[in-house]
């Protein structure tokens, strides 16, 4: 079952967001377990929403550990972090939950 992680990152400034994002896009491909999909949404001048889908909850948990280390390394740029996770549900037409 696919498992998703969504992380809202709020930065101290626009410059902090840009600095963090540029470091992140260079860092994650070589350090985070393989993802099914990954997207980012800039929700304001000083915040972004990171969304990743993994093949399993176990892979997502491994990714969480690695990503949190990156967040710690870049903490000087961060104001706040909110993280959510759970199984990925289909939103296709007529999708039924069992």
Stretches with model-predicted labels:
Residues 1-69, 76-98:
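Short S/T/G/P-rich N-terminal loop/turn motif that feeds into the first structured element of a domain
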């Amino acid at each position: 079952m696919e498992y998703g992680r969504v992380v809202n990152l709020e930065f101290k400034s626009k410059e902090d967001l840009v600095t963090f994002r540029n470091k992140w896009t260079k860092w994650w491909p070589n350090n985070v377990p393989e993802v099914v999909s990954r997207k980012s949404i800039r929700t304001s001048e000083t915040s972004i929403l990171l969304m990743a889908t993994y093949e399993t909850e176990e892979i997502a948990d491994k990714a969480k550990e690695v990503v949190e280390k990156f967040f710690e390394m870049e903490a000087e740029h961060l104001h706040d972090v909110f993280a959510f996770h759970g199984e990925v549900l289909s939103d296709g037409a007529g999708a039924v939950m069992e």
